Amino acid sequence: MQGLAATTTNRGSLTFLAPRNHSPISKKFVNPRVFFPNVDSSAKLRLSASSISRRCPREIAPLSATASVDFAAAATSSNQLFANGLPPLAPGLRRHRRPIEPARVAKDDFFKIKLPKIAERPEWWWRTLACVPYLISLQISDVGFYVQPFLEKHDAIGDMIYFIPGAINRWPTWFFMVYCYLGYMWVVKNKELPHYLRFHMMMGMLLETALQVIWCTSNFFPLIHFKGRFGMYYWMAIGFTYICLLLECIRCALAGVYAQIPFMTDAASIHTLFNLGGFQRPLR
C-alpha cells in the first residue's frame, strides 16, 4: 500500500486511510518534507512523530506490512467525513462478485392458449354428448368418397365402405350450414354449458372445415384431381388420417380430457374463451 498513511487522533479512536498527497490533516500541522534514507522497507514506513507532536496533537502512525489496521473503523470514519461525494468503503479487502450464471433456454409460451384445468372428471352424459359432434362430422364429410376407389380396387376390404358413416347414405347439403350455425351460437357461445362440451363441439366443426379446405386446395394439383394411381393413394391417406383424428378425439371425449391436435386445439380454445366480432358491451 504505497502512498497511504493511517491517521489517528488523541481524543477518540478515529482512524482513517488517506493518500499522502491528499491528507485530510491541514498542511500547517504536518511537515511536508519527509526524507527516507536508503534503508530497508520497514524503516521507510517510520515517521518522525516528535516533530509533528509539537505543533499538532494528532499523530501519524506508521503503516507497516505487519501492522493490523481496523478497517471497520476506517470505513465508519470515511463515511462520516466523505458522505457527500465519495462512496462508502467496503468492510473487507476482497469484493464478493456474483457468479456468472450460464445462459439457459426459456420455453416461449407466448402464442400458446392454456386450457382450463379439469378438476373433476365430467359426468358420463357430458362425455357421451361430447362424442356426438365427431360422429356428425364423420357423417357429413366426404371421407367415404375419398377412400372408395382404393377399397374397390382391393376386393378383400371392399365391404369396408359400408361401415364408414356417410359413404352410402348422405345427408342434405343444407344440413351442414344449419348445424354449424346452431351449434356455434347455442352451444359454443353458451357460457352456462361446461367448457368441456363447448370445446369438443367446436373441435368437431373445425375438423370438418379443415377437410373441406384440403379438398378445395388439392384440386389445383393435376395428378390429384384426376382419378389416377397417385390420386387414389393420396385421397386414401387423407381419408384414413381424418378417421384416425376423429377416433382420437372420441377417445379423449370419453376419457374426459381435451384433445391435443396441433393448430386445432388453440383455434377451438380461442372460439370458446373469447368473443370474436359482433356487438359487445362497451367497457365502463
Swiss-Prot record:
Subcellular location: Plastid, Chloroplast inner membrane
TM region(s), chain numbering: 131-151, 160-180, 204-224, 230-250
Tissue expression profile of the protein: Expressed in roots,seeds and non-photosynthetic tissues. Low levels in leaves.
Keyword match Transit peptide: yes
Annotated transit peptide: 1-48
Any one GO BP annotation for this protein: protein import into chloroplast stroma
Recorded phenotype for the gene knockout or disruption: No visible phenotype. Tic20-I and tic20-IV double mutant is embryo lethal.
Keywords: Chloroplast, Membrane, Plastid, Plastid inner membrane, Protein transport, Transit peptide, Transmembrane, Transmembrane helix, Transport
UniProt keyword annotation of Membrane present: yes
InterPro entries linked to this entry: Tic20 (IPR005691)
Main location: plastid
GO CC, any one term: chloroplast
Membrane protein topology class: Multi-pass membrane protein
Family statement: Belongs to the Tic20 family.
NCBIfam families assigned to the protein according to its UniProt record, in alphabetical order: 3a0901s05TIC20
Subunit structure: Part of the Tic complex.
Function recorded in the entry: Involved in protein precursor import into chloroplasts. Partially redundant with TIC20-I, but not with TIC20-II or TIC20-V.
Protein name: Protein TIC 20-IV, chloroplastic
Source organism: Arabidopsis thaliana (Mouse-ear cress)
Taxonomy of the source species: Eukaryota, Viridiplantae, Streptophyta, Embryophyta, Tracheophyta
Gene: TIC20-IV
